């Protein structure tokens, strides 16, 4: 594999994208065209010291692609509007659906692979389960415009008759890890817990508003960003080496396959700081109650079936690594 080959990475200033950029650098890939809205100052530290060939503003990408002489070997499309509390669907539609269609169509035209970020938010309240088969997206009812936009693009992709050389859409579950601080309100519960502990010595969690879940026992599939980028890199290598099988194209869950409680998560955060747990339960805002997922758990059988063998971080190990090696020392990945 030629490590000088050009890779396009969208969302490169963001949380997962900047970690992906560093992981590519660590593996000898530096000819990377990074794409994002680089005007956001809080994100600058995520990307400015990493290695890349050119930084292109998100809205200029397609003009640049038309003029670009070198054909990229793959596009890793992680850029999106990810705010689950942004209820204006048109914002999500523009960035998460229409923009993604343009990326897809470019990959089709150039016959190059595409890996893009979908989301577990597509699964809604989980009434239809968490299987990453290709029938389910047409039944799903996401709880917010973000989840809806991701599901709309998944459905659109599945209905196409022309495809990129290879393609996968990855349904990220609850991702946590370094380089997420710019997300603030939308950052992981671990990030919020760490900051609450530092400030007040106590972590506030939402009470449960369902009788079948105790306070703090709401369950999520929390996945460490280091696991995510390993999977994306594994797929990238197979695709650009022509070792990916077209029969494996499609949607994939990306969690750990094991749901854990918010209480477990917060306890692990306290433990990472060598402190006793101190949790207080507060009322969930009314406007969130109908839009809240009480349980998510990725069915990971499909990714395992196609040959991915790496073990995922346990919640305790992932949180410990994040807290001790990044949050407590204020380091970036």
For each predicted feature, which ranges?
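Residues at the starts of beta-strands that form the adenosine-phosphate
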Residues: 6, 30-32, 113, 166, ...
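Conserved hydrophobic helix-helix packing surfaces used for dimerization/oligomerization
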Residues: 6-7, 75, 251
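NAD(P)H-binding glycine-rich loop region in Rossmannoid oxidoreductase-like domains
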Residues: 49, 58-95
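Catalytic helix-loop patch of NAD(P)-dependent Rossmann-fold dehydrogenases
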Residues: 94, 98-102, 109, 122-169, ...
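SDR active-site strand-loop-helix element
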Residues: 10, 35, 75-79, 114-120, ...
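N-terminal Rossmann NAD(P)H-binding glycine-rich loop of SDR-like oxidoreductase domains
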Residues: 7-27
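Glycine-rich phosphate-binding loop and adjoining beta1-alpha1-beta2 segment
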Residues: 34-61
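C-terminal substrate-binding subdomain of Rossmann-fold SDR/epimerase-dehydratase oxidoreductases
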Residues: 199-333
